[in-house]
Amino acid sequence: MIDEDISKIAETLSKEEFKLNNDERIINALERIATSLEIIAHNKIHNTKLKNNANPISSNNVFNSINNDSQYIENFLMKKGVTIKFVPEINSEINDVLYSLASFMGNNYSKISSVYKAIKSRLSSGESVKIDMKNFTQEEISYSCQFCHNLYELTFLDYYKYLKSPKYQIILAPNRIPLVINFLTGHWLESYVVYEIKKLINYFNIKKEVSFLLNPQICLPNGDDFELDILFSVDDNIYWIESKTSDYHHYVEKYSKVAKILNSENLHPYLLLTEVPQQTCNKLTNLFGMKVLNIENFSEFLFRELEQYKTHIIPEEAYNVENNENE
């Protein structure tokens, strides 16, 4: 009798436990459905903005005051036995608005990296993601929310919602148009580099000849095809900057070999990484003979590098690209 009662109690408890687990699953499912419905509702309104603002071209392009005659750089490459196969036109979609966004990302990367990587992981599917920020610092929460707000305003996010205390969560879904995918998967970092260069050229009021060659597709002397990220020259010096937002392991040696082919006292090759501490960057520099930089130190490094060409420093408000409408 006692055994039978124990068996019944155990069976009842088992059913209750299943019910609780099942209820929890139902609640979670309902939350996901509610989020999806909210996203769909927002998309109907937000996609109207997208159609009108997918390509908001600003008249104040950051290249306006730069001589973009890249002949000096091209001649240098040809003397090294390099054939230039194709040079794309400057991407008109990467206008001042996106350069400003790239600058925000680059200068605050450590504070927004968790949210950025969560967004990037959903670009292929467009699915929503819930980001728990309970362990974030207040600064990380603030900058992450600002980052998402900026993306949403530009229609880079189809959906964005911030849940305040006690949840401290961000729910978002990325837009999957080509401009967004291209920019957030890595082109933002190139844009950040170009933006910082331009800003410092203005800041130091550099009068030397300055030119850019962006994303040229080349053929090396051994017949291998290759694509360079950013080449820019100041006077007789040429700076070559490659940038990687993710796995760099398969590229460092390739870049090092190309640097040896292009070797010259006038060439300064650099590799910019986002996910690698400067201590590791220093080790890579010593190992491969190519200067490797962490994004946290890039702006300061570039400042010191371009300072040598300064004519005189002009007031900050005059070189701030975001606010200077007459460059």
Feature map (PLM): residue ranges:
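Extended alpha-helical segments
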Residues: 1-52
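Intrinsically disordered, low-complexity Ser/Thr/Pro/Gly-rich regulatory segments
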Residues: 30, 48-327
